[in-house]
């Protein structure tokens, strides 16, 4: 039976290092002797239910760890469930009891170190690169046991589309990229190709061949096929390591790149510069024949370089871009890769790329920027020296990317511990039940205090293409080391509320200087246009995005400003200014003023805002209005808020809820769920906007109807149903945030209970 282990309890490894005793660490371990018959039956039932309903609900409910934690804590829901018949007759007690039921349920799910675990996955292209890398390095059997493989196969089979392919995420249509690499993964795991049958492999291979073959894989896929030896580097767009020599005054250089692309490309450029290819095996030779409609020896690789299946092509590749990459290829391969320049420049560039890799690996404790760069870095370190400590340190961190749920084993981003914890704590702090959950609040506050970055990256970090981090919070844990602006804002919001509480109640508080450090980070990250970026201060010219070689997502070259990050920053800085009116007051005021103008400038004609990190226009509208209201705006004095309220009232469904399709994100226009169904996460977000927009003072019925939906949706144990996938990454890749079904619904009920209490 699989069990989730937290922090130092997950065991130690001499090749692991940590900044805070592995706080937030999440490791899944298999124990063949664990679990009673009843527990094993419960897990099997959850798996079967997902498989039976996977065509309707493709994002899992993340049940396995929840079952485990509730059992370990002997949780029993003692507050009676509420059922509403008439929305007009909801009482304060009805809403409050529903809220308390949910709060008590969430308190039982808190880990011992104070955070809330959760899946943060959904991308179908994360698993296979880990399998390919470990196959190449000869460590596949050491890292992935038979039980790991069983769960990985479960995941692939559960999320294979009816046409035989796999999408970029669990919701999407089939992509060449994901179908090819998942096919390879199946073959590495020993699944027979079964060319004439109806097996997963046979259907996947048919899809690949019917759509032109693996030469139509986008760049990331081509890179993995090249290192495996089932594609040729000459068929890839160039990734020259000489790029890292570009000085800071160049329009594009290592410092201007979007941090995630930078982290990925430094390892890709190393592998490209060395033209590394794995030693051929019988399986590799078979794959060369299975992935293409023509013989491998007859493929013209130069013609394949710019190919991309139409199913994968989200960000169009222009003629200007094609010309640009042809010129780069000519210069890179015809000059830099030939004598004497290969000795004078190329070899030095390869060494420089590896120096960057080692620096960034050490600075992130070998977690790197996420699942995509992690595995490229790991392979590059093995190519440099298979016996090196660098590679062994990478191997020791692979388990940190593994998550197991009822749909199987998936590689996740690296976790959303801080992000989810900050939201859950804000809900609990707003629920007015402090005395009932004091130990939960104390542990949560401790987790945030200990997870803040107290130093900048090590050494000469500017020349190593890193930005400041002191005072920030990351997305997952302190060890990873990358500050994220909205995680800073939401975590600081919690810490400011805790700061206002008595020490007798909450215990040890953060030093005020650390609160100041967090504010300094936010002020630093605001751009001239008033928006705030997410990982680093934005730099570089926007026209550079025209040159992006990444076909399946958008805005990948540069750091950008984001609506949600700006809204969150305004909220917390408005609170900070009230609690600490003497610290950088004028700068904070200026930040808020510019931030409000930025938010208003992004509003769409229908009154909504596009959400960059959630689904989508409802999500964006929530963060926008939250920021506007925190800055002192109201329905009466702000046209933007009035338009936002009208937008939500216009799209409220007959049931009283809201539900938005993930298709809104790539299409960039509002699309309701099929059948105008309700989603509790969107309903919670919309309900909060209406209350913040003063709807209770004008016509409270739409709010009451939405509250009825949430109250009646709550399950017997206090949980809410997992319905649709609710996160997104770079417009076109969906992410599963199962905890959103709890945090946004309960957060909405905190607003609602306070609103109806005022009517008493």
UniProtKB/Swiss-Prot annotation:
Listed GO biological process terms: triterpenoid biosynthetic process
Superkingdom field: Eukaryota
Gene Ontology CC annotations of this record: lipid droplet; plasmodesma
InterPro entries reported in the protein's UniProt record: SQ_cyclase_C, SQ_cyclase_N, Squalene_cyclase, Terpene_synthase_CS, Terpenoid_cyclase/PrenylTrfase
Enzyme Commission number: 5.4.99.56
Catalytic activity: (S)-2,3-epoxysqualene = tirucalla-7,24-dien-3beta-ol
PFTB repeat segments: 149-190, 641-682
Gene3D superfamilies from the UniProt entry: 1.50.10.20
Residues the record marks as active site: 486 (proton donor)
Phosphoprotein as UniProt keyword: no
Listed GO MF terms: lupeol synthase activity
Entry keywords, A to Z: Isomerase, Repeat
PANTHER family reported for this sequence: TERPENE CYCLASE/MUTASE FAMILY MEMBER, TIRUCALLADIENOL SYNTHASE-RELATED
Summary of the function given for this chain in its UniProt record: Converts oxidosqualene to tirucalladienol.
Family under the similarity heading: Belongs to the terpene cyclase/mutase family.
UniProt name for this protein: Tirucalladienol synthase
Originating organism: Arabidopsis thaliana (Mouse-ear cress)
Gene: PEN3
């Amino acid at each position: 039976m699989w069990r989730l282990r937290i922090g130092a309890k997950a065991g130690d490894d001499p090749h692991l290092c940590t900044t805070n005793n592995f706080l937030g660490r999440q490791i899944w371990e298999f124990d063949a002797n664990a679990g009673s018959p009843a527990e094993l039956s419960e897990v099997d039932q959850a798996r079967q239910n997902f498989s039976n309903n996977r065509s309707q609900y493709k994002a899992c409910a993340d049940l396995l760890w929840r079952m485990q934690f509730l059992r370990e804590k002997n949780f029993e829901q003692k507050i009676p469930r509420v059922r509403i018949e008439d929305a007009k007759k909801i009482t304060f007690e009805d809403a409050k009891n529903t809220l308390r039921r949910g709060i008590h349920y969430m308190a039982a799910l808190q880990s011992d170190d104070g955070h809330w675990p959760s899946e943060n996955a959904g991308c179908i292209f994360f698993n296979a690169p880990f399998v390919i890398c470990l196959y190449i390095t000869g460590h596949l059997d050491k890292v992935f046991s038979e039980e790991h493989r069983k769960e990985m196969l479960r995941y692939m089979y559960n999320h294979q589309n009816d046409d035989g392919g796999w999408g970029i995420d669990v919701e999407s249509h089939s992509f060449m990229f994901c179908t090819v690499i998942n096919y390879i993964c199946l073959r590495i795991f020993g699944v027979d190709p079964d060319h004439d049958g109806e097996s997963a492999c046979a259907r996947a291979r048919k899809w690949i061949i019917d759509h032109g073959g693996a030469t139509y894989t986008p760049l990331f896929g081509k890179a993995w096929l090249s290192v495996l030896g089932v594609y040729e580097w000459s068929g890839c767009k160039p990734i020259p390591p000489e790029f890292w020599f570009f000085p800071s005054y160049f329009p594009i250089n290592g410092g201007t790149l979007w941090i995630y692309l930078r982290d990925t490309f430094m390892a890709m450029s190393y592998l490209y510069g060395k033209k590394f290819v794995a030693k051929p095996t019988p399986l590799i030779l078979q794959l060369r024949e299975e992935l293409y409609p023509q013989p491998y020896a007859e493929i013209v690789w130069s013609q394949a370089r710019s190919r991309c299946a139409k199913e994968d092509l989200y960000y169009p590749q222009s003629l200007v871009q094609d010309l640009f990459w042809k010129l780069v290829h000519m210069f890179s391969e015809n000059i830099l890769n030939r004598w004497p320049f290969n000795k004078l420049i190329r070899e030095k560039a390869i060494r420089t790329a590896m120096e960057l890799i080692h620096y960034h690996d050490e600075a992130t404790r070998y977690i790197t920027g996420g699942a995509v760069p992690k595995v490229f870095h790991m392979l590059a370190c093995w190519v440099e020296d298979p016996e090196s400590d660098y590679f062994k340190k990478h191997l020791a961190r692979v388990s940190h990317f593994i998550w197991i749920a009822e749909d199987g084993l998936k590689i996740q981003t690296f976790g959303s511990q801080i992000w989810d914890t900050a939201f859950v704590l804000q809900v609990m702090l707003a629920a007015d039940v402090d005395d009932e959950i004091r130990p939960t609040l104390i542990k949560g506050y401790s987790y945030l205090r200990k997870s803040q970055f107290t130093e900048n990256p090590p050494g000469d970090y500017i020349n190593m293409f890193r930005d400041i981090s002191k005072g920030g919070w990351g997305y997952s844990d302190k060890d990873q080391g990358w500050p994220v602006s909205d995680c800073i804002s939401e975590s600081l919001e919690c810490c400011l509320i805790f700061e206002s509480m008595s020490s007798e109640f909450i215990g040890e508080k953060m030093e005020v200087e650390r609160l100041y450090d967090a504010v300094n980070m936010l002020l630093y990250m605001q751009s001239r246009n008033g928006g705030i970026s997410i990982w680093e201060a934005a730099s570089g010219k926007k026209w550079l995005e025209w040159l992006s070689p990444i076909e399946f997502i958008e805005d990948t070259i540069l750091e950008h400003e984001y609506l949600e990050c700006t809204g969150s920053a305004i909220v917390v800085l408005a609170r900070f200014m009230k609690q600490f009116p003497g610290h950088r007051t004028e700068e904070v005021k200026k930040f808020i003023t510019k931030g409000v103008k930025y938010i208003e400038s992004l509003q769409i004609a229908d009154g909504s805002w596009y959400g960059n990190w959630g689904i989508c226009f409802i999500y964006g509208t929530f963060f926008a209005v939250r920021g506007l209201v925190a800055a002192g705006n109201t329905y009466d004095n702000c046209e933007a808020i009035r338009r936002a309220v009208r937008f939500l009232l216009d799209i409220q469904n007959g049931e009283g809820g809201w539900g938005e399709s993930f298709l809104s994100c790539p299409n960039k226009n509002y699309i309701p769920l099929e059948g105008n169904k309700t989603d509790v996460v969107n309903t919670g977000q919309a309900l909060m906007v209406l209350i913040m927009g003063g709807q209770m003072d004008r016509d409270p019925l739409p709010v009451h109807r939405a509250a009825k939906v949430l109250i009646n949706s709550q399950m017997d144990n206090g949980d809410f149903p997992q319905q649709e996938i609710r996160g997104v990454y770079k417009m076109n890749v969906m992410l599963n945030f199962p905890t959103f079904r709890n945090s946004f619904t309960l957060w909405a009920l905190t607003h609602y209970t306070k609103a109806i209490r005022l009517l008493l």
